Amino acid sequence: MKPIHMNRMSWPEYQRRVQKDGATVFLPCGATEQHGPHLPLGTDHLLAAAVSESVATRVGGLVAPPLAYGYKSQPKCGGGQHFCGTTSLDAATLIGQVRDTVREFARHGVRQLVLCNGHYENQWFLTEGIDLAIRDLGPNPPLTVMRLEYWDFFTNPTLERIFPEGFPGYALEHAAVLETSMMLHYHPDLVRLDLIPDDGPADFPPYDLYPPEPAWVPPSGVLSSAKAATKEKGGWMVEELTDRIAAAVRKEFG
C-alpha cells in the first residue's frame, strides 16, 4: 500500500503523487476543545484525521497534517470557551489560514482537495476561506475543493440503530455517543470509560447571550450522556462514513 501521510513523505515523493498520479488530498479540520473528562482535547481533529485516513486509503488519496485549532467553542454545541484547554481562533484567523492553505495546495499542483471537518463551529469559516482562495486563483482555478462534515454521511437507519430511544441531534452530541464510539474505534487508548459523567442532556434556551453564560453548560462539558457508547457502534459508523464519503469523492473527482 502506498503511504498516505503528506508529512511523512519527501517533497519529490509528494510531488509525484499529486502532479503525476493526480492524488486527491484530504485536509482534516478540527479543534482543540474540551470533550468532557473521558475524551482528549484533540478529539475533533483526531476524528477528522482518522476519517480522512480511512477514505484516503480507499480512494488512493493523501492526508495532509490537520488544522488542529478551530473557531471558538459555542455553549450549545461545544460547551463554550470557559473550559481550560479549549484553544480557539477568531473567525478572521481561521478564514485566513484556510485561504492560505488552499492556495498553497493549488501551488503544489493539487487538483482535488477535500476539507474534512470535525468541529461543528468551523463550517461557515471554512467555506469563506475556500471561497476567497478560489477567487484569488482567478476565473479558471486549477483545483476543485470539496468541503464536508463527516457526520452528514450518517444515514437515518444507522442513527436509529445507534439511538433506539431517539437521536438527540448533532449539537447535543458533543462528547457523547457518536464521538465516544468513534474514538473507541480509532483511538481506544485515549478513552476513559470510567470517567464518563452523568451530565446531560443539556437544556438550552432558544437564544444566545453575550458574554456567554457558563451556567448553561453541564460542569463536565458533556452535552448528552456518552454511557451508551461502544466500540461496536463506532465500527458501524466508520464503515458507513468510509463507504459514503469515498463514493462522494469518486463521484466528483473520478
Where do the model's predicted regions map?
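Extended, histidine- and acidic-residue-enriched regions that form the cofactor-binding/catalytic faces
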Residues: 1-113, 118-254
